[in-house]
Amino acid sequence: MALRPCTGFTISSLRNASAANNNLFSLLSFSSSSPAKRNLLLSSLQDNLRRFASSASLYRQHLRNQQQQHQQQQQSRVKEKSETLAQKIGKSIRRAGAPSKARVYADVNVVRPKDYWDYESLAVQWGVQDDYEVVRKVGRGKYSEVFEGIHATDNEKCVIKILKPVKKKKIKREIKILQNLCGGPNIVKLLDIVRDQQSKTPSLIFEHVNNKDFKVLYPTLSDYDVRYYIFELLKALDFCHSRGIMHRDVKPHNVMIDHEQRKLRLIDWGLAEFYHPGKEYNVRVASRYFKGPELLVDLQDYDYSLDLWSLGCMFAGMIFRKEPFFYGHDNYDQLVKIAKVLGTDELNAYLNKYRIELDPNLTSLVGRHSRKPWTKFINSENQHLAVPEAVDFVDKLLRYDHQERPTAKEAMAHPYFYPIRNAESSRTPRSQ
Protein backbone atom coordinates (compact mmCIF):
# COMPACT_ATOMS: atom_id res chain seq x y z
CA MET A 1 0.00 0.00 0.00
CA ALA A 2 1.35 3.41 -0.99
CA LEU A 3 1.97 5.86 1.85
CA ARG A 4 1.05 9.52 1.44
CA PRO A 5 3.77 11.99 2.42
CA CYS A 6 3.22 13.60 5.83
CA THR A 7 2.53 17.30 5.23
CA GLY A 8 1.33 18.38 8.68
CA PHE A 9 -2.09 19.53 7.46
CA THR A 10 -5.28 18.33 5.77
CA ILE A 11 -7.70 19.87 3.31
CA SER A 12 -10.25 20.18 6.16
CA SER A 13 -7.77 22.20 8.24
CA LEU A 14 -7.60 24.71 5.39
CA ARG A 15 -11.40 24.89 5.31
CA ASN A 16 -11.56 25.37 9.12
CA ALA A 17 -9.03 28.20 8.91
CA SER A 18 -11.08 29.81 6.17
CA ALA A 19 -14.29 29.48 8.22
CA ALA A 20 -12.60 31.03 11.27
CA ASN A 21 -11.54 34.00 9.17
CA ASN A 22 -15.10 34.46 7.91
CA ASN A 23 -16.41 34.48 11.51
CA LEU A 24 -13.85 37.12 12.47
CA PHE A 25 -14.86 39.31 9.53
CA SER A 26 -18.47 39.03 10.77
CA LEU A 27 -17.46 39.95 14.31
CA LEU A 28 -15.53 42.95 13.04
CA SER A 29 -18.58 44.19 11.20
CA PHE A 30 -20.85 44.05 14.26
CA SER A 31 -18.37 44.80 17.04
CA SER A 32 -18.57 47.87 19.14
CA SER A 33 -16.36 50.79 18.41
CA SER A 34 -14.20 49.89 21.46
CA PRO A 35 -10.54 50.17 20.34
CA ALA A 36 -9.46 47.43 22.76
CA LYS A 37 -11.97 44.91 21.37
CA ARG A 38 -11.17 45.91 17.81
CA ASN A 39 -7.39 45.46 18.38
CA LEU A 40 -8.01 42.05 19.96
CA LEU A 41 -10.10 40.95 17.00
CA LEU A 42 -7.53 42.31 14.51
CA SER A 43 -4.74 40.44 16.28
CA SER A 44 -6.77 37.24 16.20
CA LEU A 45 -7.52 37.77 12.51
CA GLN A 46 -3.83 38.30 11.70
CA ASP A 47 -2.90 35.08 13.54
CA ASN A 48 -5.52 33.15 11.57
CA LEU A 49 -4.36 34.69 8.28
CA ARG A 50 -0.75 33.73 9.02
CA ARG A 51 -1.83 30.15 9.83
CA PHE A 52 -3.90 30.05 6.65
CA ALA A 53 -1.02 31.39 4.51
CA SER A 54 1.35 28.85 6.05
CA SER A 55 -1.11 26.01 5.41
CA ALA A 56 -1.70 27.16 1.84
CA SER A 57 2.06 27.32 1.22
CA LEU A 58 2.50 23.81 2.59
CA TYR A 59 -0.37 22.57 0.45
CA ARG A 60 1.13 24.10 -2.70
CA GLN A 61 4.46 22.44 -1.86
CA HIS A 62 2.60 19.16 -1.31
CA LEU A 63 1.03 19.44 -4.78
CA ARG A 64 4.43 20.22 -6.33
CA ASN A 65 5.97 17.20 -4.60
CA GLN A 66 3.16 14.96 -5.84
CA GLN A 67 3.59 16.31 -9.38
CA GLN A 68 7.36 15.70 -9.26
CA GLN A 69 6.79 12.18 -7.91
CA HIS A 70 4.34 11.49 -10.73
CA GLN A 71 6.82 12.77 -13.36
CA GLN A 72 9.63 10.68 -11.86
CA GLN A 73 7.40 7.58 -11.87
CA GLN A 74 6.49 8.24 -15.52
CA GLN A 75 10.16 8.71 -16.48
CA SER A 76 11.08 5.58 -14.55
CA ARG A 77 8.39 3.57 -16.38
CA VAL A 78 9.61 4.88 -19.76
CA LYS A 79 13.22 4.07 -18.82
CA GLU A 80 12.26 0.57 -17.62
CA LYS A 81 10.38 -0.01 -20.89
CA SER A 82 13.42 1.23 -22.87
CA GLU A 83 15.80 -0.97 -20.88
CA THR A 84 13.53 -4.00 -21.33
CA LEU A 85 13.39 -3.36 -25.09
CA ALA A 86 17.13 -2.69 -25.25
CA GLN A 87 17.85 -6.12 -23.73
CA LYS A 88 15.94 -7.71 -26.63
CA ILE A 89 17.53 -5.67 -29.44
CA GLY A 90 19.68 -7.57 -31.91
CA LYS A 91 21.97 -6.33 -34.69
CA SER A 92 20.52 -4.64 -37.74
CA ILE A 93 20.41 -6.63 -40.98
CA ARG A 94 22.13 -5.26 -44.09
CA ARG A 95 20.83 -6.63 -47.40
CA ALA A 96 23.23 -6.95 -50.32
CA GLY A 97 23.22 -4.52 -53.22
CA ALA A 98 23.79 -1.11 -51.59
CA PRO A 99 27.53 -0.74 -50.92
CA SER A 100 28.92 2.56 -49.67
CA LYS A 101 32.19 4.20 -50.71
CA ALA A 102 33.86 7.46 -49.66
CA ARG A 103 33.17 10.37 -52.03
CA VAL A 104 36.77 11.60 -51.72
CA TYR A 105 40.18 10.11 -50.95
CA ALA A 106 38.70 6.63 -51.46
CA ASP A 107 41.78 5.13 -53.10
CA VAL A 108 44.57 6.80 -51.11
CA ASN A 109 45.66 3.52 -49.52
CA VAL A 110 45.09 1.59 -52.76
CA VAL A 111 47.79 3.56 -54.57
CA ARG A 112 50.15 3.93 -51.58
CA PRO A 113 52.78 1.25 -50.94
CA LYS A 114 51.72 -1.44 -48.45
CA ASP A 115 54.20 -0.35 -45.79
CA TYR A 116 52.31 2.98 -45.52
CA TRP A 117 49.20 1.33 -44.05
CA ASP A 118 50.40 -2.13 -42.94
CA TYR A 119 50.89 -1.16 -39.30
CA GLU A 120 51.21 -4.76 -38.09
CA SER A 121 54.60 -4.94 -39.80
CA LEU A 122 55.85 -1.79 -38.03
CA ALA A 123 59.19 -2.14 -36.24
CA VAL A 124 58.98 0.34 -33.35
CA GLN A 125 62.13 2.36 -32.62
CA TRP A 126 62.11 2.77 -28.83
CA GLY A 127 63.55 5.87 -27.18
CA VAL A 128 64.99 6.19 -23.66
CA GLN A 129 62.31 6.40 -20.94
CA ASP A 130 64.69 8.03 -18.43
CA ASP A 131 64.83 11.10 -20.69
CA TYR A 132 61.39 12.07 -19.38
CA GLU A 133 60.01 12.88 -15.93
CA VAL A 134 56.37 12.83 -14.88
CA VAL A 135 55.12 16.07 -13.27
CA ARG A 136 51.40 15.54 -12.71
CA LYS A 137 48.42 13.54 -13.94
CA VAL A 138 46.17 15.42 -16.35
CA GLY A 139 43.71 12.79 -17.52
CA ARG A 140 42.79 9.19 -18.11
CA GLY A 141 40.90 7.24 -20.72
CA LYS A 142 39.80 3.71 -21.50
CA TYR A 143 43.18 2.81 -22.99
CA SER A 144 45.65 5.15 -21.30
CA GLU A 145 46.65 7.50 -18.50
CA VAL A 146 47.97 10.95 -19.43
CA PHE A 147 50.55 13.01 -17.56
CA GLU A 148 52.24 16.34 -17.96
CA GLY A 149 55.98 15.78 -18.06
CA ILE A 150 59.32 17.39 -18.83
CA HIS A 151 62.30 16.38 -20.92
CA ALA A 152 65.07 15.74 -18.39
CA THR A 153 67.85 17.45 -20.36
CA ASP A 154 66.22 20.69 -21.51
CA ASN A 155 63.22 20.94 -19.11
CA GLU A 156 60.85 21.33 -22.10
CA LYS A 157 57.24 20.48 -21.23
CA CYS A 158 55.68 17.45 -22.88
CA VAL A 159 52.69 15.12 -22.52
CA ILE A 160 53.29 11.48 -21.56
CA LYS A 161 50.58 9.01 -22.59
CA ILE A 162 51.12 5.71 -20.73
CA LEU A 163 49.22 2.98 -22.57
CA LYS A 164 47.22 0.36 -20.68
CA PRO A 165 47.68 -3.31 -21.67
CA VAL A 166 46.08 -3.71 -25.11
CA LYS A 167 46.83 -5.74 -28.23
CA LYS A 168 50.20 -4.87 -29.77
CA LYS A 169 48.64 -4.23 -33.16
CA LYS A 170 46.42 -1.48 -31.69
CA ILE A 171 49.48 0.29 -30.27
CA LYS A 172 51.31 -0.14 -33.58
CA ARG A 173 48.32 1.30 -35.45
CA GLU A 174 48.30 4.47 -33.34
CA ILE A 175 52.07 4.90 -33.73
CA LYS A 176 51.99 4.31 -37.50
CA ILE A 177 49.14 6.79 -37.98
CA LEU A 178 50.88 9.46 -35.87
CA GLN A 179 54.08 8.95 -37.85
CA ASN A 180 52.22 9.22 -41.17
CA LEU A 181 50.50 12.43 -40.07
CA CYS A 182 53.56 14.05 -38.48
CA GLY A 183 53.85 17.72 -39.47
CA GLY A 184 50.25 17.98 -40.66
CA PRO A 185 48.23 21.11 -39.80
CA ASN A 186 46.91 21.03 -36.24
CA ILE A 187 47.84 17.36 -35.72
CA VAL A 188 49.39 16.74 -32.30
CA LYS A 189 53.09 16.00 -32.76
CA LEU A 190 54.51 12.66 -31.61
CA LEU A 191 57.97 13.36 -30.16
CA ASP A 192 59.11 9.95 -28.95
CA ILE A 193 58.08 6.37 -28.13
CA VAL A 194 59.49 4.76 -24.96
CA ARG A 195 58.80 1.75 -22.76
CA ASP A 196 59.58 0.58 -19.26
CA GLN A 197 62.45 -1.93 -19.20
CA GLN A 198 60.81 -4.19 -16.57
CA SER A 199 57.07 -4.07 -17.34
CA LYS A 200 57.47 -3.32 -21.08
CA THR A 201 54.67 -0.75 -20.70
CA PRO A 202 54.83 1.61 -23.71
CA SER A 203 54.42 5.38 -23.50
CA LEU A 204 53.93 7.96 -26.23
CA ILE A 205 55.56 11.38 -25.79
CA PHE A 206 53.71 14.34 -27.34
CA GLU A 207 54.15 18.08 -27.69
CA HIS A 208 52.59 20.04 -24.81
CA VAL A 209 49.51 22.20 -25.39
CA ASN A 210 48.41 24.67 -22.70
CA ASN A 211 44.81 23.52 -22.97
CA LYS A 212 41.82 24.93 -21.09
CA ASP A 213 38.92 22.58 -20.25
CA PHE A 214 36.29 22.97 -22.98
CA LYS A 215 33.51 23.26 -20.37
CA VAL A 216 35.25 26.41 -19.12
CA LEU A 217 36.50 27.71 -22.47
CA TYR A 218 33.53 27.22 -24.82
CA PRO A 219 31.07 29.47 -22.94
CA THR A 220 33.59 32.34 -23.27
CA LEU A 221 34.14 32.01 -27.04
CA SER A 222 32.87 34.71 -29.39
CA ASP A 223 31.17 34.03 -32.72
CA TYR A 224 34.47 34.67 -34.51
CA ASP A 225 36.36 32.35 -32.11
CA VAL A 226 33.98 29.46 -32.84
CA ARG A 227 34.36 29.98 -36.60
CA TYR A 228 38.15 30.14 -36.23
CA TYR A 229 38.57 26.97 -34.15
CA ILE A 230 36.13 24.87 -36.18
CA PHE A 231 38.00 25.96 -39.34
CA GLU A 232 41.31 24.93 -37.70
CA LEU A 233 39.80 21.55 -36.79
CA LEU A 234 38.61 21.06 -40.38
CA LYS A 235 42.19 21.63 -41.57
CA ALA A 236 43.33 18.71 -39.41
CA LEU A 237 40.47 16.50 -40.63
CA ASP A 238 41.02 17.27 -44.30
CA PHE A 239 44.72 16.50 -43.87
CA CYS A 240 44.20 13.13 -42.17
CA HIS A 241 41.46 12.16 -44.66
CA SER A 242 43.73 13.10 -47.57
CA ARG A 243 46.27 10.67 -46.06
CA GLY A 244 43.68 7.87 -46.01
CA ILE A 245 42.98 8.03 -42.26
CA MET A 246 39.70 8.33 -40.30
CA HIS A 247 40.01 9.74 -36.75
CA ARG A 248 36.81 8.04 -35.45
CA ASP A 249 36.78 9.85 -32.08
CA VAL A 250 36.25 13.55 -32.76
CA LYS A 251 34.87 15.28 -29.65
CA PRO A 252 35.71 18.32 -27.48
CA HIS A 253 37.84 16.18 -25.14
CA ASN A 254 40.17 15.37 -28.06
CA VAL A 255 40.54 18.93 -29.32
CA MET A 256 43.20 20.79 -27.35
CA ILE A 257 42.99 24.59 -27.51
CA ASP A 258 45.59 27.05 -26.23
CA HIS A 259 43.37 30.11 -26.45
CA GLU A 260 46.14 32.62 -25.66
CA GLN A 261 48.21 31.33 -28.58
CA ARG A 262 45.08 30.56 -30.67
CA LYS A 263 46.55 27.11 -31.21
CA LEU A 264 44.46 23.96 -31.78
CA ARG A 265 45.61 20.35 -31.85
CA LEU A 266 43.59 17.21 -32.67
CA ILE A 267 44.75 14.50 -30.26
CA ASP A 268 44.07 10.85 -29.30
CA TRP A 269 44.52 8.81 -32.45
CA GLY A 270 43.98 5.53 -30.59
CA LEU A 271 40.75 4.73 -32.47
CA ALA A 272 41.94 6.08 -35.83
CA GLU A 273 42.06 3.67 -38.77
CA PHE A 274 43.21 3.47 -42.39
CA TYR A 275 40.36 3.68 -44.91
CA HIS A 276 40.05 0.92 -47.50
CA PRO A 277 37.00 1.05 -49.81
CA GLY A 278 34.56 -1.79 -49.22
CA LYS A 279 36.12 -2.81 -45.91
CA GLU A 280 33.74 -3.44 -43.01
CA TYR A 281 34.83 -1.70 -39.83
CA ASN A 282 33.99 -2.08 -36.15
CA VAL A 283 30.98 0.11 -35.24
CA ARG A 284 32.06 0.25 -31.59
CA VAL A 285 34.11 3.42 -32.09
CA ALA A 286 33.61 7.11 -31.21
CA SER A 287 32.08 8.32 -27.95
CA ARG A 288 28.33 7.85 -27.56
CA TYR A 289 27.19 11.48 -27.90
CA PHE A 290 29.25 11.84 -31.10
CA LYS A 291 28.45 8.51 -32.78
CA GLY A 292 27.12 8.85 -36.31
CA PRO A 293 23.82 7.16 -37.29
CA GLU A 294 25.84 4.71 -39.42
CA LEU A 295 27.40 3.29 -36.23
CA LEU A 296 24.05 3.13 -34.43
CA VAL A 297 22.38 1.14 -37.25
CA ASP A 298 25.39 -1.17 -37.79
CA LEU A 299 26.46 0.13 -41.20
CA GLN A 300 30.04 -1.14 -41.27
CA ASP A 301 31.40 0.19 -44.58
CA TYR A 302 31.48 3.75 -43.26
CA ASP A 303 34.17 6.26 -44.18
CA TYR A 304 35.71 9.68 -43.41
CA SER A 305 32.23 11.25 -43.29
CA LEU A 306 31.82 9.78 -39.78
CA ASP A 307 34.24 12.47 -38.56
CA LEU A 308 32.03 15.18 -40.09
CA TRP A 309 29.00 13.96 -38.10
CA SER A 310 31.05 14.03 -34.88
CA LEU A 311 32.25 17.53 -35.76
CA GLY A 312 28.60 18.50 -36.36
CA CYS A 313 27.61 17.29 -32.87
CA MET A 314 30.48 19.24 -31.35
CA PHE A 315 29.62 22.35 -33.38
CA ALA A 316 25.90 22.13 -32.48
CA GLY A 317 26.85 21.95 -28.80
CA MET A 318 28.95 25.10 -29.20
CA ILE A 319 26.49 27.31 -31.11
CA PHE A 320 23.35 26.23 -29.25
CA ARG A 321 25.13 26.11 -25.86
CA LYS A 322 23.79 22.59 -25.32
CA GLU A 323 26.50 20.13 -24.34
CA PRO A 324 26.22 17.38 -25.38
CA PHE A 325 23.75 18.17 -28.15
CA PHE A 326 22.41 14.59 -28.48
CA TYR A 327 22.28 13.21 -24.93
CA GLY A 328 21.49 9.48 -25.16
CA HIS A 329 21.55 7.17 -22.12
CA ASP A 330 22.87 4.28 -24.23
CA ASN A 331 23.54 3.59 -27.92
CA TYR A 332 19.88 2.78 -28.65
CA ASP A 333 18.65 5.89 -26.85
CA GLN A 334 21.28 7.87 -28.78
CA LEU A 335 19.47 6.97 -32.02
CA VAL A 336 16.18 7.99 -30.38
CA LYS A 337 17.61 11.39 -29.42
CA ILE A 338 18.82 11.93 -33.01
CA ALA A 339 15.44 10.86 -34.45
CA LYS A 340 13.62 13.34 -32.21
CA VAL A 341 15.56 16.14 -33.93
CA LEU A 342 16.07 14.91 -37.49
CA GLY A 343 12.78 12.98 -37.76
CA THR A 344 11.97 9.33 -38.45
CA ASP A 345 10.84 9.79 -42.07
CA GLU A 346 14.39 10.87 -42.90
CA LEU A 347 15.80 7.95 -40.87
CA ASN A 348 13.64 5.46 -42.78
CA ALA A 349 14.74 6.94 -46.12
CA TYR A 350 18.37 6.43 -45.03
CA LEU A 351 17.72 2.84 -43.96
CA ASN A 352 15.94 2.06 -47.23
CA LYS A 353 18.75 3.56 -49.34
CA TYR A 354 21.37 1.32 -47.74
CA ARG A 355 18.97 -1.64 -47.38
CA ILE A 356 19.22 -1.78 -43.60
CA GLU A 357 16.55 -3.48 -41.49
CA LEU A 358 16.52 -2.48 -37.84
CA ASP A 359 15.60 -5.00 -35.19
CA PRO A 360 11.81 -4.59 -34.61
CA ASN A 361 12.45 -3.79 -30.94
CA LEU A 362 14.75 -0.91 -31.93
CA THR A 363 12.13 0.34 -34.42
CA SER A 364 9.58 0.27 -31.59
CA LEU A 365 11.96 2.09 -29.26
CA VAL A 366 12.70 4.83 -31.82
CA GLY A 367 8.96 5.42 -32.47
CA ARG A 368 7.76 8.14 -34.84
CA HIS A 369 8.94 11.75 -34.73
CA SER A 370 8.65 14.74 -37.03
CA ARG A 371 11.72 16.78 -37.91
CA LYS A 372 12.41 19.61 -35.44
CA PRO A 373 13.38 23.00 -36.92
CA TRP A 374 16.80 24.26 -35.83
CA THR A 375 15.20 27.56 -34.79
CA LYS A 376 13.66 25.70 -31.82
CA PHE A 377 17.14 25.53 -30.29
CA ILE A 378 17.84 29.27 -30.55
CA ASN A 379 17.31 31.45 -27.47
CA SER A 380 18.56 34.71 -25.97
CA GLU A 381 21.62 32.93 -24.52
CA ASN A 382 22.92 31.58 -27.84
CA GLN A 383 21.48 33.80 -30.58
CA HIS A 384 24.83 35.61 -30.99
CA LEU A 385 26.38 32.26 -31.99
CA ALA A 386 23.46 30.54 -33.74
CA VAL A 387 23.50 32.97 -36.67
CA PRO A 388 21.87 31.93 -39.99
CA GLU A 389 25.16 30.77 -41.60
CA ALA A 390 25.97 28.68 -38.50
CA VAL A 391 22.54 27.04 -38.53
CA ASP A 392 22.87 26.28 -42.24
CA PHE A 393 26.30 24.75 -41.64
CA VAL A 394 25.12 22.51 -38.77
CA ASP A 395 22.17 21.43 -40.93
CA LYS A 396 24.57 20.26 -43.65
CA LEU A 397 26.77 18.35 -41.19
CA LEU A 398 24.03 16.57 -39.24
CA ARG A 399 22.58 14.42 -42.02
CA TYR A 400 21.61 10.77 -41.59
CA ASP A 401 23.01 9.91 -45.00
CA HIS A 402 26.79 10.07 -44.60
CA GLN A 403 27.19 10.65 -48.34
CA GLU A 404 25.14 13.86 -48.09
CA ARG A 405 27.48 15.40 -45.52
CA PRO A 406 30.14 17.77 -46.85
CA THR A 407 33.72 16.60 -46.96
CA ALA A 408 36.15 18.48 -44.71
CA LYS A 409 37.38 20.48 -47.72
CA GLU A 410 33.81 21.31 -48.83
CA ALA A 411 32.97 22.32 -45.25
CA MET A 412 35.86 24.80 -45.23
CA ALA A 413 34.33 26.50 -48.30
CA HIS A 414 30.99 27.11 -46.52
CA PRO A 415 29.91 30.82 -46.23
CA TYR A 416 30.10 30.48 -42.42
CA PHE A 417 33.90 30.59 -42.73
CA TYR A 418 34.08 33.61 -45.05
CA PRO A 419 35.49 35.90 -42.28
CA ILE A 420 38.20 33.31 -41.51
CA ARG A 421 39.15 32.72 -45.14
CA ASN A 422 39.18 36.48 -45.71
CA ALA A 423 41.47 37.05 -42.70
CA GLU A 424 43.81 34.25 -43.84
CA SER A 425 44.05 35.57 -47.40
CA SER A 426 44.87 39.07 -46.14
CA ARG A 427 47.72 37.62 -44.01
CA THR A 428 49.14 35.55 -46.88
CA PRO A 429 51.84 37.52 -48.74
CA ARG A 430 51.11 37.84 -52.44
CA SER A 431 53.67 36.45 -54.86
CA GLN A 432 55.55 39.00 -56.93
From Swiss-Prot:
Against InterPro entries, the record matches this protein to: CK2_alpha, Kinase-like_dom_sf, Prot_kinase_dom, Protein_kinase_ATP_BS, Ser/Thr_kinase_AS
Q: Which UniProt keywords apply?
A: ATP-binding, Chloroplast, Kinase, Nucleotide-binding, Plastid, Serine/threonine-protein kinase, Transferase, Transit peptide
- Covalent S-S links between cysteines: none
- What reaction is this protein's catalytic activity? L-seryl-[protein] + ATP = O-phospho-L-seryl-[protein] + ADP + H(+); L-threonyl-[protein] + ATP = O-phospho-L-threonyl-[protein] + ADP + H(+)
Q: Where mainly located?
A: plastid
Q: Which CDD domains match?
A: STKc_CK2_alpha
Top-rank taxon of the source lineage equals Eukaryota
> Which ranges are annotated Low complexity under compositional bias?
66-75
Transit peptide feature range: 1-55
Q: Does the keyword Acetylation apply?
A: no
Record-listed E.C. numbers: 2.7.11.1
What's the name of the protein? Casein kinase II subunit alpha-4, chloroplastic
Q: Name the lineage.
A: Eukaryota, Viridiplantae, Streptophyta, Embryophyta, Tracheophyta
